[in-house]
A protein has these predicted regions:
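Mature catalytic domains of secreted/periplasmic carbohydrate-active enzymes
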Residues: 38-42
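Short, glycine-rich nucleotide/cofactor-binding loops
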Residues: 59-69
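Conserved class I S-adenosyl-L-methionine
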Residues: 94-105
């Protein structure tokens, strides 16, 4: 029997929090070593893509450095479909992981690219996540 890992405080499985649906193509960058365990159980037919591109439904990007995040956001904005979801995760302050990113930093970098944030969640005890989508008028 598969064990369901509950992420954060809600008791909701992480894959559901992130909106991963059956048949989705997902690209993950910089995830912690136990990410596969955190996502379990995955919906049927989920495929992990090596690269972010027009065929990807959801990207989960983990970042600790503002400069790296700025570059990746700009690159992803060009590569992804307008209806793809982009989750950006950063270390929570209480985690003591060195970072130059906060929730406000993500907004500061993403909003000028045409993204808007629509959801926030705890990924695990270290990482928080902010869901970004392209503004409706730009889709």
């Amino acid at each position: 029997m598969a064990t369901t890992v509950r992420s954060g405080y809600s008791g909701t499985p992480l894959a559901r929090k992130l909106g991963i649906k059956p048949g989705h193509r997902v690209h993950v960058h910089g995830a912690p070593d136990d990410y596969a365990r955190l996502l379990a159980p995955l919906p049927e037919g989920v495929v992990f893509a090596r690269r972010a591109g027009a065929d990807v439904d959801l990207v989960h990007l983990f970042a600790t450095a503002r400069e790296d995040l700025a570059k990746r956001l700009a690159s992803l904005r060009k590569a992804l479909r307008a209806d793809a979801a982009l989750w950006v995760s950063w270390p929570q302050r209480a985690s003591k992981v060195a970072t130059t990113i906060t929730e406000d930093t993500i907004r500061e970098l993403a909003l000028p690219l045409g993204y808007v944030d629509i959801k926030v969640c705890a990924v695990d005890a270290v990482w928080s996540g902010l869901k970004l989508v392209v503004r409706k008028e730009l889709r």
